[in-house]
């Protein structure tokens, strides 16, 4: 289901046809300033890789999967709609899917467009893609999964992560893939399949959505500096 920023419900096939796409996957629970700043930087980087005509037709989407890849649990449908309302209040288009795996999402988008696609993701999700438990039902394993993900000019745009314990700042270029996939990952970087997104806002990176959830529950006002005002009201 695709909810447009203007409140309309649309068919993805109609809206995305022949359009370049910038898509951010996330739970958006809650929607926070980090999501917005990273999305803006991903889009800026993506637009520098396509021509002006393509840039004019670029479609920005926030996607929420009803099967969360990192948590593996289902959540209440009304909660999904609340998150969608928060994103729409910020002028974002929202796609709700049931796809945990990136290769399935890439395949879905490939039905609608042959233009370049940027999928924005965090270091945490990038690390998750190398776990074999997600490809047990794919004959070709991780290699086939990545092959499907990168079909039709789809690229992964990876935002950095700040390790709050060690202070290490991890980017797509410094990310350490599992030992058996180090050379494969270097191939992805060298060929532009994985794109390093330049971003650093230490204040935002130090507070995860789960931190913000705890702040809201504890009635700590600092959460209001981490969540856009439009989402306060939604």
Question: Where are the regions a protein language model picked out?
Answer:
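Nucleotidyltransferase catalytic core that binds NTPs
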Residues: 1-234
């Amino acid at each position: 289901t695709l909810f447009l920023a203007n409140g309309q419900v649309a068919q993805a096939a109609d809206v995305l046809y022949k359009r370049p796409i910038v898509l951010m996957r996330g739970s958006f629970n809650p929607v926070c300033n980090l999501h917005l700043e990273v999305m803006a930087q991903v889009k800026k980087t993506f637009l520098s890789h396509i021509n002006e005509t393509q840039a004019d037709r670029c479609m920005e989407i926030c996607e929420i999967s009803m099967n969360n890849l990192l948590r593996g649990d289902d959540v209440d449908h009304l909660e999904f709609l609340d998150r969608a309302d928060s994103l729409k209040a910020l002028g974002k288009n929202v796609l709700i899917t049931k796809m945990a795996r990136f290769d399935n999402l890439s395949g879905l988008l490939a039905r609608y467009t042959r233009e370049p696609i940027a999928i924005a993701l965090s270091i945490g999700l990038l690390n998750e893609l190398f776990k074999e438990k997600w490809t047990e039902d794919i004959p070709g394993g991780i290699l086939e999964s990545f092959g499907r993900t990168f079909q039709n000019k789809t690229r992964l745009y990876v935002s950095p992560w700040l390790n709050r314990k060690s202070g290490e700042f991890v980017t797509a270029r410094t990310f350490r893939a599992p030992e058996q996939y180090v050379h494969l990952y270097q191939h992805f970087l060298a060929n532009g399949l994985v794109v390093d997104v330049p971003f650093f806002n230490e204040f935002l990176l130090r507070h995860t959505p789960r931190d913000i959830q705890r702040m809201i529950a504890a009635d700590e006002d600092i959460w209001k500096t981490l969540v856009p005002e439009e989402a306060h009201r939604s």
